[in-house]
Amino acid sequence: MGEKIEISTINKRKLLVLDLDETLIHTAYSPLSSGCLIAQQGYFYLYERPYLKEFLDRCSTEYDFAIWSASKADYVRWIIRSTVLSEFAFVFVNTRKNCKRVFAKDGRVEYIKNLSPYITQYEKVIMLDDVPKMVIPIGCCIKAPEFRGGADDFLLNVSC
């Protein structure tokens, strides 16, 4: 996980970098009253955002995919194995160790996802994330509404 690549090495296709938590999936410590439970591991209940497979199928005609999550590697591997993400190839999978750790004004730890070292052509890269302020450069991020496990049609309507 976390190999550096140049976008120009990806068959001249565009790159769609995907965040996981609250963008494509939601995990909860107890079962939710709505939503489609995909998997359970220990105290984690995993919910996949509706229309994820349709979105990825639609985007795969023009984009290569990568994952960048501020979560730990074992958790990210579990998410990929447990969801439709396992059916797709990824140019890279970055986790918390690839993020820059910063402290917010209130003392909370936040993790910045800096795409700059990974790309040479910014116009060919888009990131989908629910917290675009944590992505550098900011201009390449599409904000996804926070997903909390229930009914949702964002991925059905967002264009690639």
Predicted regions located by residue number:
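Non-catalytic pre-domain segments flanking phosphatase-related domains
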Residues: 1-20, 29-34
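Core residues of folded domains in eukaryotic genome-function proteins
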Residues: 12-25, 55, 61-64, 89, ...
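Short interface patches used for recognition in eukaryotic signaling and trafficking proteins
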Residues: 6-9, 37-46, 60-65, 144
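Amphipathic alpha-helical protein-protein interaction segments
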Residues: 11, 18, 41-52, 65-69, ...
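Eukaryotic intrinsically disordered and solvent-exposed regulatory patches
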Residues: 2-5, 9-12, 49-54, 110-115, ...
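Substrate-recognition element of Asp-dependent hydrolases with the DxDx(T/V) motif
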Residues: 52-80, 96
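C-terminal cap/substrate-recognition subdomain and adjoining C-terminal extension
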Residues: 74-160
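Metal-dependent phosphoesterase signature
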Residues: 25-49
